[in-house]
């Protein structure tokens, strides 16, 4: 869907707490395969280590990173695939910004 319009999305990514020093570079690398499709990272914020409300994949805490980016609808599936294939990623939550 290269012809579809770019929309703004916000993604919360939780990584293992052992990846705190390189969290930003690890998350940026997940977007590298989709950059040729027009995906642009606008803002990336590392929130640090956060305690989870419940155990996820055997972990009680992780590094949380929030990413705001522009992408077309076709690129979202590939971003999700990249997240699922990366063992460092514990959990993700994707939201379309401005949608009511």
Swiss-Prot record:
Domain of life: Bacteria
TM region positions: none
InterPro entries per record: Ribosomal_bS6 (IPR000529), Ribosomal_bS6_sf (IPR035980), Ribosomal_S6_plastid/chlpt (IPR020814), Transl_elong_EF1B/ribsomal_bS6 (IPR014717)
Disulfide bridge partners, by residue number: none
Gene Ontology MF terms: rRNA binding; structural constituent of ribosome
Residues annotated as signal peptide: none
GO cellular component assignments: ribonucleoprotein complex; ribosome
One GO-annotated biological process of the protein: translation
Keywords linked to the UniProt accession: Ribonucleoprotein, Ribosomal protein, RNA-binding, rRNA-binding
Summary of the function given for this chain in its UniProt record: Binds together with bS18 to 16S ribosomal RNA.
UniProt family annotation: Belongs to the bacterial ribosomal protein bS6 family.
Name of the protein in question: Small ribosomal subunit protein bS6
The species this protein was found in: Tropheryma whipplei (strain Twist) (Whipple's bacillus)
